[in-house]
């Protein structure tokens, strides 16, 4: 027969247990709050069309592998669809918005009327810019050139940006502006999206080309005032894999990132979007990002 304890003893145990659990819950909430308060800048670099196995462990990507070992690697991060543009749109709006193939230029009627991350960022009084390498002019959306494609510039696909010439041209700018903007933390946008050109993003060129480009620019970003004087986060990921293999490398770096850390937890573009929203206390854009696991485990 189970042993019965006096009601007073049970009540005392409940009080003790509550006293033990409440501080733990508060500590967990405090940890997330502290992280949200201390991430000032978020930089996202999106490379192209390579599986994780083509990057991690590859002799063609020595810089990326060294960066992953030094900082953090999401070893089970996957694109959502084998369509780069779909993943770009999902990463910035919480849905592929019905775009399941490559559609360019956005001026051909492909833009969608969807609330997006740029809207949330501006509403929170933060700043943002997308730096596109080899873009012919600020806000250019008319079509592909030898090295540039608007299909790698997701914010051009939102009608509230595409149809607003001033907003488009002031936020979607040539990559050559980045060194000037990054000279001071105060002039570095809070949210930065970097789209390398087709030679450097690995889409139409060997992995080694992209690795060399990142080796040139990532150290400059990490050594910039935004990263040395304020807590900032850099994420390097890929838009999609190849065929049925949609596992892509995703590397996190910066002073707020754990060192020598690898996670086997499954993540996707909605996870990265939800992480940004959580860090900056932005409202989720859809149920997709609202329900996605955050990547806060990579932060320290």
For each feature predicted by the language model, list its residue ranges:
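N-terminal Sec-pathway targeting helices
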Residues: 1-12
